[in-house]
């Protein structure tokens, strides 16, 4: 999926770095400067593959390119030893809560066993369903899993990140979160599906539910619910996104980053929505350990 709102930011980046349209076009594999000109004016799209190539070619951090202040997460609680050396407070009880995606399982939490030196690691289990049906389940399970802990870290995958933002923002003991291929706007996901299949609001309202060719089912009740979603997420969050993700589109991701100054983006240039190969799991491990 392409992103049309990125044009002014690309132009600003190019100007700040004294690049001509010809030079930028050549470095990104475009034929001629006219493509860059159209992108900057908002008349043409720039795919996330090209954005990832831009980041890699010019050794940029996504937050730097989009002028997003990726503030560091709050440090873990510390105490000052007699020698004035700052060390971590070993008396704190810490837990990592993993929230799986669609058709996933809490058992996937075992993939994060390497964190057990400092954290208990648990998975939050839930059955797929409508968001309004899952609210009490997810909040109840999360409270049960985190009771008695001083510090909580959330690792959420795909739609699990949506549930975290939607239902866990009021839990004050969450110190940091890691979102992998997060669905950051369920409403936008539904709108994109409707556009893809040529479905209008009126048609969905009249039919109530529409089964799509890919097996997904659109529901008007679901559409109404997510249209009123309110994101109050303030937790310092690391976001991992595949450049070839065909589920979460560029526009949704950029809006999330702009709306959440405590979020920081990492793009894996050769990944899709699902991170499941041994190499991709090693990438996730290094990504988490780098900032936790």
Language model features by range: what are they?
Residues 1-17:
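A short, Lys/Arg-rich alpha-helix, primarily the initiator
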Residues 174-267, 271-292:
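The alpha/beta-hydrolase serine catalytic core
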Residues 47-64:
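DNA major-groove recognition helix of helix-turn-helix/homeodomain DNA-binding modules
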Residues 66-90:
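Short, charged recognition helix plus adjacent turn
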């Amino acid at each position: 999926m392409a992103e049309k709102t990125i044009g002014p930011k690309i132009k600003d980046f190019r100007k700040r770095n004294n690049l001509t349209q010809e030079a930028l076009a050549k470095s990104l594999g475009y034929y001629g400067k006219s493509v860059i000109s159209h992108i900057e004016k908002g008349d043409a799209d720039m795919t996330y593959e090209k954005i990832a190539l831009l980041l890699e070619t010019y050794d940029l951090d996504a937050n730097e390119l989009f002028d997003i202040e990726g503030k560091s997460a709050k440090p873990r609680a510390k105490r000052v030893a007699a020698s004035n050396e700052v060390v971590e407070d070993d008396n704190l009880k810490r837990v990592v809560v993993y929230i799986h995606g669609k058709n996933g399982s809490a058992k996937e939490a075992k993939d994060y066993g390497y964190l057990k030196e400092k954290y208990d690691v648990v998975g939050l289990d839930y059955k797929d369903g409508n968001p309004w049906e899952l609210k009490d389940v997810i909040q109840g399970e999360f409270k049960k899993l985190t009771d008695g802990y001083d510090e909580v870290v959330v690792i959420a995958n795909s739609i699990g990140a949506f549930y975290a933002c939607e239902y866990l923002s009021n839990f004050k003991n969450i110190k940091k979160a890691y979102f992998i291929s997060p669905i950051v706007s369920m409403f936008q996901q539904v709108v994109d599906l409707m556009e893809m299949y040529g479905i209008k609001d009126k048609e969905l309202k009249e039919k109530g539910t529409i089964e799509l060719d890919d097996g997904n089912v659109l529901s008007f009740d679901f559409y109404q619910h997510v249209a009123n979603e309110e994101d109050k997420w303030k937790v310092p969050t690391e976001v991992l996104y595949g450049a070839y993700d065909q589920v979460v589109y560029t526009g949704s991701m950029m809006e999330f980053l702009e709306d959440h100054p405590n979020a920081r983006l990492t793009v894996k240039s050769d990944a899709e929505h699902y991170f499941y190969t041994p190499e991709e799991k090693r990438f996730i491990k290094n990504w988490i350990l780098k900032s936790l």
